[in-house]
């Protein structure tokens, strides 16, 4: 059996930013039932159990949102606990998370290092490009906070990469 990859959306479309191009927030505002809430620990356990029951060799578990860090470190600690509990086939498990990076702190960084997470941070260019699209609900840019958190990830030794959105508008904004 080929390696299994699973995408978990623990926060549904919930997010602490209001990015101009994000379809989650726009879609949620138009649905009869906006957000479906946060994934329960019971559902997480069921997903991990089922995924690992069918995994052979290796398995990648990726988390994204919305903003997955809104689910909190305890949610992700439970995921690691369930991975250890249900890994009866002794598969190699890779964990990854895609985040806007705004909620990261030292505790998150230490968790990522301790549990060997690959962290994708969304950063859309320099301050003008990034802040043009990635704003707080109050309309303020998020670039400075994201860059501070990227520096903290570096210092802590977190394995991370950058995911960027590019558009003609971004190209026309001078850094």
Give the role of each language-model region.
Residues 2-39:
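Canonical Radical SAM [4Fe-4S] cluster-binding loop centered on the CxxxCxxC motif
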Residues 3, 40-43, 136, 141:
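Serine/threonine-rich low-complexity intrinsically disordered regions
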Residues 36, 44-47:
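Secondary-structure boundary/capping micro-motif
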Residues 48-49, 53-62, 71-175:
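Radical SAM/AdoMet-radical enzyme domain recognition
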Residues 66-67:
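Active-site neighborhood of divalent metal-dependent phosphoester/pyrophosphate hydrolases
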């Amino acid at each position: 059996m080929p390696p299994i990859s699973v995408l978990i959306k623990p926060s549904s479309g919930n997010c602490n930013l209001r990015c101009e191009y994000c379809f989650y927030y726009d879609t949620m505002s138009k649905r009869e039932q906006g957000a479906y809430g946060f994934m329960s620990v019971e559902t997480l356990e069921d997903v991990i159990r089922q995924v690992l029951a069918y995994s052979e060799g290796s398995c990648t578990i990726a988390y994204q949102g919305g903003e997955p860090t809104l689910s909190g470190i305890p949610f992700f600690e439970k995921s690691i606990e369930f991975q250890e509990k249900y890994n009866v086939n002794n598969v190699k498990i890779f964990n990854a998370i895609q985040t806007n990076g705004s909620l990261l702190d030292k505790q998150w960084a230490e968790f990522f290092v301790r549990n060997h997470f690959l962290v994708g941070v969304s950063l859309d260019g320099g301050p003008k490009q990034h802040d043009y699209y990635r704003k707080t609900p109050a309309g303020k840019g998020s670039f400075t906070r994201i860059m501070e958190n990227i520096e903290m990830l570096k210092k802590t030794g977190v394995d991370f990469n950058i995911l960027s959105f590019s558009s003609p508008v971004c190209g026309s904004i001078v850094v």
